[in-house]
From Swiss-Prot:
Family: Belongs to the NARF family.
Leader sequence residues: none
A Gene Ontology term for the protein's cellular component: cytosolic [4Fe-4S] assembly targeting complex
This protein's name: Cytosolic Fe-S cluster assembly factor NAR1 homolog
């Protein structure tokens, strides 16, 4: 059993008081009202005939969490109970000969395991690959590096088209990837499911600002199921995709109905490094029990397309949350203003460790061309909301939307400071590298208490240890066109939609439970 506590998780959430997603009640006739209790079971007894029927157990699904406004994002305890490593073991034990199992691992989760076991990320990749292919019967183990490059590329194209539409200015930008529906500025990142749930449940007026690009997890899940289903000639139902991710809300993301194709989810199950360690303990598996030198990355990944890079150790420049801001800033500087060298062109303003602003200045006039920010942790997200208005939730959303529109389209203020064009938003303080599912320091590390900033920096050092890389835009475009030859397919599969969750304003418990 995985045990969680407030000090283990960032922004830890118990199920809300209003977490009472109603179970459908079947109306009974007057002669069917008696309830009989026997041990741990409950039975309904018909008065006239004496017929006994065992009552089912009421339960809450992940879809219920997505449709309920009782919690701000989700309750980690619910996520653990409904999608855990026990599910992995159940499917592994039930695997049939024609089933095809895939593990996709995020670089942040890999770095967490590397720091925890004092290994390099390369050694962790080899170890996890060996465990899952040899011990757990998985067919393929990949990371989400390549799918992240697809997401970054799509997000940059979306931003540039939105910026041009909002500014109605002539630039050197010429998109060869079709036209996407422009977003009002600032464009807000969408790879963090905790942030997305927060917007959908409490500030739905901001949905038009949210990037529609799928996260790397969902891009990879769809791509891998499509490819192996076609390549192996098997149904998507026979392909089971497991994700190893740094946060629990990724379980919710995988459960969204938007990510279902042919009644099959693109990602079937999500676990975190904490849960993986518990799984390995049940099988008495540790890195020390394996000869890592005898393993090779190239020994697996059968049938993968030649254009799909299964493992990327080098990371993109920028944040350890995927580098969205850095990539989009670099891409937009070239695409919009024909600026190739950003050296001495970026002014950085740090409000706190989790709120940093970046300004791109003109090499000729010194004026601000683009202004972007990273915003991590609900404290900063709440501050953003509080600075705009503190009325009712719908009112706050409308005021915030109006203010943000004015911010993005109005000329510079008297101080010459331009308003934000793009924000990389993550729910966890420190971003994805400090996700709630990441491992704490080993018990032998007495210098740390909980997940501290120092420990987070150590995990981040492992994340960037192999070095940095630039996205090969031409290779990514070629891969996308090979996989999705038409623009309509690209829009359908690489983008998604968001949905406002109706607040139960007539429920006094729900009203009292607002954040």
């Amino acid at each position: 059993m995985v045990k969680l506590s407030a000090e283990d998780l960032n922004d830890y959430l118990n199920p809300g008081v209003a977490c009472v997603k109603p179970v459908k009640v079947q109306k009974k006739q007057d002669n069917q009202q008696n309830i009989k209790v026997n041990g741990e079971s409950y039975y309904e007894v018909t008065k006239d005939t004496g017929e006994v029927e065992e009552l089912g157990i009421a339960s809450i699904s992940l879809n219920d969490c997505l449709a309920c406004s009782g919690c701000i994002t989700s309750a980690e305890s619910v996520l653990i109970n409904l999608q855990s490593y026990h599910e992995v073991l159940k499917f592994v034990n039930a695997k049939e000969a024609d089933d095809f199992f895939i593990l996709q691992m995020s670089p942040q989760a890999r770095a967490s395991l590397a720091a925890y076991y004092n290994l390099s990320v390369q050694e962790v990749q080899l170890w996890i690959q060996s465990v899952f292919t040899n011990e757990l019967k998985f067919n393929v183990v990949v990371d989400t590096g390549f799918s992240r490059e697809i997401s970054l590329r799509q997000a940059a194209i979306e931003f540039c088209q939105s910026w041009v539409a909002a500014n109605a200015a002539k630039t050197v930008y010429n998109s060869k990837s079709g036209e996407v529906a422009p977003k009002p500025l600032p464009v807000l990142s969408s790879s963090c499911p905790g942030w997305i749930c927060y917007v959908e449940k409490t500030h739905s007026s901001l949905i038009p600002h949210i990037s529609t690009v799928r996260s790397p997890q969902q891009v990879a899940g769809r791509l891998l199921k499509d490819w192996f289903s076609y390549q192996l000639g098997i149904s998507r139902k026979k392909i089971w995709v497991l994700s190893l991710m740094p946060c629990f809300d990724k379980k919710l993301e995988a459960s969204r109905n938007d990510f279902v194709n042919e009644q099959v989810r693109d990602v079937d199950c999500v676990i975190t490094p904490k849960e993986l360690v518990e799984l390995l303990k049940t099988k008495n598996i540790s890195p020390q029990s394996m000869d890592l030198d005898s393993l090779s990355i190239s020994e697996q990944t059968p049938c993968l397309p030649s254009w799909y890079e299964p493992v990327q150790f080098e990371q993109q420049n920028g944040s350890s949350s995927g580098g969205y801001l850095h990539y989009i800033m670099t891409f937009a500087a070239k695409a919009l203003f024909d600026i190739n060298d950003l050296t001495n062109r970026i002014n950085v303003s740090q409000k706190n460790a989790d709120m940093i602003e970046y300004e791109l200045t003109s090499p000729d006039t010194g004026e601000t061309l683009l202004r972007m920010a990273t915003c991590y942790g609900f404290r900063n997200i709440q501050n953003l909301v509080r600075n705009v208005g503190r009325k009712s939730a719908p009112r706050r959303g409308r005021v915030l939307l109006k203010r943000m529109k004015n911010m993005s389209t109005s000329p510079s203020t008297g101080t010459g400071k331009q308003k934000l064009d793009y924000v990389e938003v993550m729910a966890c303080p420190g971003g994805c590298i400090n996700g709630g599912g990441q491992l704490p320091p080993p018990e032998s590390s007495a210098d740390f208490s909980g997940i501290s900033r120092e420990w987070m920096r150590q995990v981040e050092a492992h994340y960037f240890q192999p070095g940095v890389r630039q996205v090969d835009n031409a290779a990514v475009d070629a891969a996308v066109e090979h996989w999705l030859p038409s623009y309509s397919l690209q829009q359908s599969i690489l983008h998604t939609k968001y949905h406002a969750v109706q607040n139960d304003t007539e429920n006094p418990v729900a009203l009292a439970n607002t954040w």
